[in-house]
Amino acid sequence: MAKKSLIQREKKRHKLEQKYHLIRRSSKKKIRSKVSPLSLSEKTKMQEKLQSLPRNSAPTRLHRRCFLTGRPRANYRDFGLSGHILREMVYACLLPGATRSSW
């Protein structure tokens, strides 16, 4: 089980990312625009605007966690579970459609 403080920190990052998502996306779109290219000074202003946003609002700062244990490693996207919890649940027949492989 992960520490509660780490799980709360991750939730806080997720909220910040959602809050600043549109601002971040629109400013990046303006910087990269080929249709109406910006001058160098305008690009630097947009870059400064991006840098002024909180660090934890960047999507790369997020980490996918197991929703039962909070474990940050070995997560399966399809189930939202870490590997060892997924294995235990499959063996206990708690996940429909998932079976042990045998050949």
Swiss-Prot record:
InterPro entries the UniProt entry points to: Ribosomal_uS14, Ribosomal_uS14_bac/plastid, Ribosomal_uS14_CS
Keywords: Chloroplast, Plastid, Ribonucleoprotein, Ribosomal protein, RNA-binding, rRNA-binding
TM regions (residue ranges): none
Gene name as annotated: rps14
SUPFAM superfamilies (alphabetical): Glucocorticoid receptor-like (DNA-binding domain)
Organism of derivation: Sorghum bicolor
Membrane among keywords: no
Record region (Disordered): 26-56
Name of this chain's protein: Small ribosomal subunit protein uS14c
GO molecular function, one term: structural constituent of ribosome
PANTHER family hit by this protein: 30S RIBOSOMAL PROTEIN S14, SMALL RIBOSOMAL SUBUNIT PROTEIN US14M
Subunit structure: Part of the 30S ribosomal subunit.
Family according to the record: Belongs to the universal ribosomal protein uS14 family.
Example of a GO cellular component annotation carried by this entry: small ribosomal subunit
GO biological process, one term: translation
